């Protein structure tokens, strides 16, 4: 069940990320270019049902809208209150559930390589859910925290200061 707890502090970073994605979405393409290696920015003006693709290892969040992802027999729903993490290449069917020209689907993500995943696993405490430790899924969602949202905001904000990307993007990405 999605966490529907409203956190007013999240609106500032969420709105800032949305503005930056919309400022770059000028050519009508859903996947926008970003000068930061591994950073993914996505805008869709209409719902799309059951698009087949392969998700690379990544952490992603939805700034506006919602999505359904089918991985084998499992269906994951996530929206503005959740984040998604994939630990390996996974074939999925994905559907953007909420999107319109007036309120487009906006997403942001960061590709991860196996070295980053291994390092994070060694240096971080084992992640948990409200019900205890996470299971061994290759893809899952979790409650979006303000620190994660703020880290994505700082990363996307670097696109407005390209002279700082080389020095700061790796630090924010690691965060």
Residue ranges with predicted function:
Residues 2-13, 17, 117-175:
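Amphipathic alpha-helical segments enriched in hydrophobic/aromatic residues interleaved with Lys/Arg
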Residues 3, 27-28, 45, 81, ...:
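Acidic-enriched, low-complexity/disordered segments with a strong bias for Aspartate over Glutamate
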Residues 14, 19-20, 24, 43, ...:
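Arginine residue identity/basic-tract feature
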